[in-house]
From Swiss-Prot:
Superkingdom field: Eukaryota
Pfam families the record matches: Pkinase
Modification type Phosphothreonine: residues: T208
Species the sequence originates in: Pongo abelii
Compositionally biased intervals (Pro residues): 428-444
Protein modification: Phosphorylated at Thr-208 by STK11/LKB1 in complex with STE20-related adapter-alpha (STRADA) pseudo kinase and CAB39. Autophosphorylation is also possible at Thr-208.
Protein name from the UniProt record: NUAK family SNF1-like kinase 2
The keyword Hydrolase is assigned to this record: no
Originating gene: NUAK2
Residues at the active site: D175
Length: 628
């Protein structure tokens, strides 16, 4: 079997074998930052993982395999995730696995887990990923109970930077939680688990109800269609609440109470208010149209306090000025005007920045609770196809309520592929005009919250929960319309051969001409070269636990070289501009990384600590008015 590599589409005109364009072709819309393009190229060599890596301890186990820590010959530590094809019984889960590989290999950001290499043979898929040695953010916060405001801002800025980058490239994560946010050896954020991610498009709605209960938005728990970014914004609000206050904002012990709290936005008032309370309230708005976007968060004053530039912006070089020059004051005035604009538009005063007294009433404070990702979706189409599909086509072909069936869960032991045909549903819904006399499309009565959640590893994909995990029972979205024609039933023998599912022209590597016609996921044999039916794969019992260490050969799907990551530079903080310095933090666990005690260090300077904040603010506004 020939091996495949992913290479950038640059230089001369690609050959016919390189015309299969995966989803990354449709990801690049914004000029900055760019994502990596991919194309498929054939090579004629195989790889033995036993000779390439020294396997160490196991990091986690899932339904389809395990994640092991390994060391390359160069000494670099990596996390190797092996997926056994004979364990994949649901085409939807296979689609999520492929989507995770293609999206993560396309993203290039210092705070997103990188995929180094992907291997595949007839029985396994092996993914070599970046290793985050300090575990996940859940364990880090649990050990320290509560972070300082400086450390909370440091973490949140990096999370916002990564999610903002994803949204710039029209990728929505949909499963942001503490367990999916890892820490590397330097204490920097690394977002993992893109198994539930997808592309989104303005004006169209996604209809996959997934995520983790305590981080799920009101649209998710109530089964309402959503665009995509607003779901991540709500999850960021929950994360910010946890980072600042050290507790969960909602009560997760009773799912009925949890649904009511999320639907009403009734999160617990913290016992000790913070300067971030305004941003938390903005992110946890029940109305998604009023909820803060990632652009709003990236330019918010609390997120950028102590930094000369907002999240996602590069520091502009100074032209011969010192911190007290007009140029520096103008920069500060522009920053204050931009970051305080939402407050001024809402008629807020400068005093609204100050902390308020905690409201009365004694309510128990919930602790941190690990979350298990939920997945309830009608099977989503090719992500690349969703970019080229016409709105009229989406409106004309919608399955009726009588034609919908609950999708098969990934934890069911028996899969009857010969009895039921795989039905393909559109991944997005176009807005439906409703006349005054016409009833609105019915929505499900039940959300995704039905049973207790289980622990899930950040390295393991959401479609691959822990062995003790359980898929929740959920209602579907029913949209009035003409029923869609079903596919003919598949032959039961087609599920025996799972070869080359990541290589040929599958769901995520179709050309523009192929996207014009409606496509289906197809069987696993349709994604691979035809093989004789007489040669069946080995039974699951014949595969040992340490089969990844065997001498079998793998085809390599080499990914393109990642763009060099710019070094994380220090920047002049507001403290330096105003001549203020903060004392070094004391106490164990207050800092995660080595903070440099120099004028360029990060700052946790709070607005409430400045005695003449009103005068400073007015002076900045006067400078701003003179410049304009």
């Amino acid at each position: 079997m020939e091996s495949l590599v992913f290479a950038r589409r640059s230089g001369p005109t690609p050959s016919a074998a390189e015309l299969a364009r995966p989803l990354a072709e449709g990801l690049i819309k914004s000029p900055k930052p760019l994502m990596k393009k991919q194309a498929v190229k054939r090579h004629h060599h195989k790889h033995n993982l036993r000779h390439r890596y020294e396997f160490l301890e196991t990091l986690g186990k899932g339904t389809y395999g395990k994640v092991k820590k390994a060391r390359e010959s160069s000494g670099r530590l990596v996390a190797i995730k092996s997926i056994r094809k004979d364990k994949i019984k649901d085409e939807q889960d296979l689609m999520h696995i492929r989507r995770e590989i293609e999206i993560m290999s396309s993203l290039n950001h210092p705070h997103i887990i990188a995929i180094h290499e992907v291997f595949e043979n007839s029985s396994k898929i092996v993914i070599v990923m970046e290793y985050a040695s300090r575990g996940d953010l859940y364990d880090y916060i649990s050990e320290r109970q509560q972070l300082s405001e400086r450390e909370a801002r440091h973490f949140f800025r990096q999370i916002v930077s990564a999610v903002h980058y994803c949204h710039q490239n029209r990728v929505v994560h949909r499963d942001l939680k503490l367990e999916n946010i890892l820490l590397d050896a330097n204490g920097n954020i690394k977002i993992a688990d893109f198994g539930l991610s997808n592309l989104y498009h303005q004006g169209k709605f996604l209809q996959t109800f997934c995520g983790s209960p305590l981080y799920a938005s009101p649209e998710i728990v109530n089964g309402k269609p959503y665009t995509g970014p607003e779901v991540d914004s709500w999850s960021l609000g929950v994360l910010l609440y946890i980072l600042v206050h050290g507790t969960m904002p909602f009560d997760g012990h009773d799912h009925k109470i949890l649904v009511k709290q999320i639907s009403n936005g009734a999160y617990r008032e913290p016992p000790k208010p913070s300067d971030a309370c305004g941003l938390i309230r903005w992110l946890l708005m029940v109305n998604p149209t009023r909820r803060a976007t990632l652009e709003d968060v990236a330019s918010h004053w609390w997120v950028n306090w102590g930094y000369a530039t907002r999240v996602g912006e590069q520091e502009a070089p100074h032209e011969g000025g010192h911190p007290g020059s007009d140029s520096a004051r103008a920069s500060m005035a522009d920053w204050l005007r931009r970051s305080s604009r939402p407050l001024l538009e809402n008629g807020a005063k400068v005093c609204s920045f100050f902390k308020q007294h905690a409201p009365g009433g004694g309510s128990t404070t919930p602790g941190l609770e690990r979350q298990h990702s939920l997945k309830k979706s009608r099977k989503e189409n090719d992500m690349a196809q969703s970019l080229h599909s016409d709105t009229a086509d989406d409106t004309a072909h919608r399955p009726g309520k009588s034609n919908l069936k609950l999708p098969k869960g990934i934890l069911k032991k028996k899969v009857s592929a010969s009895a039921e045909g795989a039905q393909e549903d559109p991944p997005e819904l176009s807005p439906i005009p409703v006349s005054p006399g016409q009833a609105a499309p019915p929505l499900p009565k039940k959300g995704i919250l039905k049973k207790p959640r289980q622990r899930e590893s950040g390295y393991y994909s959401s479609p691959e929960p822990s062995e003790s995990g359980e898929l929740l029972d959920v209602g579907d979205v029913f949209v009035s319309g003409d029923p869609k024609e079903q596919k003919p039933p598949q032959a039961s023998g087609l599920l025996l051969h799972r070869k080359g599912i990541l290589k040929l022209n599958g769901k995520f590597s179709q050309t523009a001409l192929e996207l014009a016609a409606p496509t289906t996921f197809g069987s696993l044999d349709e994604l691979a070269p035809p093989r004789p039916l007489a040669r069946a794969s080995r039974p699951s019992g014949a595969v040992s636990e340490d089969s990844i260490l065997s001498s079998e050969s793998f085809d390599q799907l080499d990914l393109p070289e990642r763009l060099p990551e710019p070094p994380l530079r220090g920047c002049v903080s507001v403290d330096n501009l105003t001549g203020l310095e903060e004392p070094p933090s004391e106490g164990p666990g207050s800092c995660l990384r080595r903070w440099r005690q120099d004028p360029l260090g990060d700052s946790c300077f709070s607005l409430t600590d400045c005695q003449e904040v009103t005068a400073t603010y007015r002076q900045a506004l006067r400078v701003c008015s003179k410049l304009t």
